[in-house]
Amino acid sequence: MEQAILRINNISSQLTGKCPFKAHGGGAGKCPYKLGGGQILDQSKAWSLVNVTANVDQVTPIKVLVTGAAGQIAYSLMFMIASGQMFGPHQPVILHLLDIPKMADALKGVVMELQDCSYPLLQSVVATTDIQTAFLHINVAILVGAFPRGPGMQRKDLLKVNVSIFKEQGEALNKYASRGVKVLVVGNPANTNALTALMKASDLPTSNFSALTRLDQNRAQSMISEKVGTNVDNVHNVIIWGNHSQTQVPDVNHGYILNYPNRGLIEPIPSSVNDDKWLNEQFIPLVQNRGATVIAARKLSSAASAANAIVGHVRDWLLGTKDGEHVSMAVYSDGSYNVPKGLIFSFPVTCHNGQWTIVQGLKINSSTQQKIDATIKELQEEKETAMSFLN
């Protein structure tokens, strides 16, 4: 196991010396991204619509759509958005909340609670069951609502129902939303639902669409922090490759831990854990099956943790990732890492000015590649099934 420890420069918060990862090509000059610090609330990194300064007198509010708005995830999410956790403490928002007609009364209750919180950043709430009203001029769309898989339901039947839902929402994005709208799909199967919406929003850039794998990344980083015995905030750059499903590929080979084993030091995750058997035989299945484990324990799917992941995904996308860090987002493949073009696939990305860029040049070992091939196969099969219904 390669040992590599660097000391942090306390003045600049940047790391000195060579990159510790052989998989990054060796020295600092070849590393595909810098290791180091950086601040999230930096106007030079933020999307043009987001205000991160203290002057909010004439700031235009961001219109944020949340679908499935009367559901559990949305209930946790919208209070986080309204309180400034997604766009920062200086950016006002207008919430557009959409749900199906039978949830209209519950939606009214959610609106009352939002009003009762008296959030300074929440300018207004548009709660509706009408898709045109919901999607009109929105800047950010968080598509949480989807048809859940019931007992005995075949995956192709689930895809058929959700293709219908996300076809309609893709068409609504194309027709009513702002041309620069940023779209995050959460409802499962998220990758293929995102692809369906993207294909029906043909006037919008493919780079405006993404699906959520941040929850998987957060789960993985939490497990690593617990295994090593450090704060989760010290664990960085764990990658989730592929589908948001049980074929997802958690990859720690490019991750590092700050202030480990002592303050002021940094060490790669594999040598910090120092247990290849655990990483390969226990850690990966634990991450892959965490959602099912939560359901088994609480008889409900993840809600608060999903909302937290949504906030982190959008915040990093629109405010920018920190220097030396990448995050996992399922985005439209451009062929990187031999992933076929035309899939929504989770990659490591960095974000700047509201645009994501896939991190290039990472070496992938044979074991990880085999798992990536399996998740590619699953996504191709999902796409083929979804397209048969779409067409």
Swiss-Prot record:
Cysteine disulfide partners in this protein: none
Function as written in the Swiss-Prot or TrEMBL entry: Catalyzes the reversible oxidation of malate to oxaloacetate.
InterPro entries: L-lactate/malate_DH, Lactate/malate_DH_C, Lactate/malate_DH_N, Lactate_DH/Glyco_Ohase_4_C, Malate_DH_AS, Malate_DH_NAD-dep_euk, Malate_DH_type2, NAD(P)-bd_dom_sf
Family annotation (PROSITE patterns): MDH
Catalytic activity: (S)-malate + NAD(+) = oxaloacetate + NADH + H(+)
NCBIfam families associated with the record: MalateDH-SF1, MDH_euk_cyt, PRK05442.1
Superkingdom to which the source organism belongs: Eukaryota
Organism: Dictyostelium discoideum (Social amoeba)
EC number, as in UniProt: 1.1.1.37
Catalytic residues as annotated in Swiss-Prot or TrEMBL: 244
A Pfam family per the record: Ldh_1_C
A biological process from GO: oxaloacetate metabolic process
Family: Belongs to the LDH/MDH superfamily. MDH type 2 family.
Keyword line: NAD, Oxidoreductase, Tricarboxylic acid cycle
GO molecular function: L-malate dehydrogenase (NAD+) activity
High-level lineage: Eukaryota, Amoebozoa, Evosea, Eumycetozoa, Dictyostelia
HAMAP family: Malate_dehydrog_2
EC class of the enzyme, as a word: oxidoreductase
Quaternary organization: Homodimer.
CDD domains on file: MDH_cytoplasmic_cytosolic
Annotated binding of substrate, by residue: 149, 155, 188, 219
Residues annotated to bind NAD(+): 68-74, 162, 169, 186-188
Protein name: Probable malate dehydrogenase 1
